[in-house]
């Protein structure tokens, strides 16, 4: 859908797409059978090197980095938040829940971060309510926490006074899908976007997935929602 590219032109930021080893990231799920995990690829080191290279070549402000990724990429975003929390200003994992404790092999810092999670209630790969992650019969990725538990983990690391909840405007005229947002705005912003009847997808009016992925949600533009949080953080800080 090129949402990030269009938004970058409008807002004046740089979009960078990192490529994982053989199309996978070495995330926190210790049991996963893809080679990035089996070979313990140093994706944290890779991320740091890319940031330094971009700073050198483009003069970016390293204090304004947003990191987002979908599915395995979302799990890599969690790893960044766990292991190098201060290297990213805003973390935005898509269709990914935290792994359960006994399958989490990340070095967990328990440092508060800005976090925005986008998960679909009809996701058959990353189950919204937690459980076994299964893709085409491959169960090696193990079990994950629920979306609510994943959100609460990051929420409870921050200091906040109240939690907000709202139903976002209906924009695609499809009453079978909708989006709710729960968040806290305290020492950090932590948010959970629930894509009601959405599947293993990136939510946007500009993107359409096949039925295999569990259902489209067109009421929000995910890139725009992430950038709104970024703008609110810059005002807040």
Kindly give the residue locations of the regions a language model identified.
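Primarily recognizes the serine-hydrolase "nucleophile elbow" in alpha/beta-hydrolase
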Residues: 56-57, 62-113, 124
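Alpha/beta-hydrolase-fold serine-hydrolase catalytic core, especially in secreted/extracellular enzymes
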Residues: 113, 152-237
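Acidic catalytic loop of the alpha/beta-hydrolase fold
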Residues: 123-126, 200-202
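Alpha-helical scaffolding within the catalytic cores
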Residues: 1-4, 98-107, 175-181
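Short beta-to-alpha linker loops that shape the active-site pocket of alpha/beta-hydrolase fold enzymes
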Residues: 19-22, 97, 198
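Soluble non-cytosolic domains of exported or imported proteins
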Residues: 37-45, 71, 82, 141-145, ...
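Short beta-strand/loop motif that positions the catalytic acidic residue
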Residues: 117-119
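Serine-hydrolase catalytic machinery in alpha/beta-hydrolase-like enzymes
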Residues: 1-66, 76-79, 83, 204-212
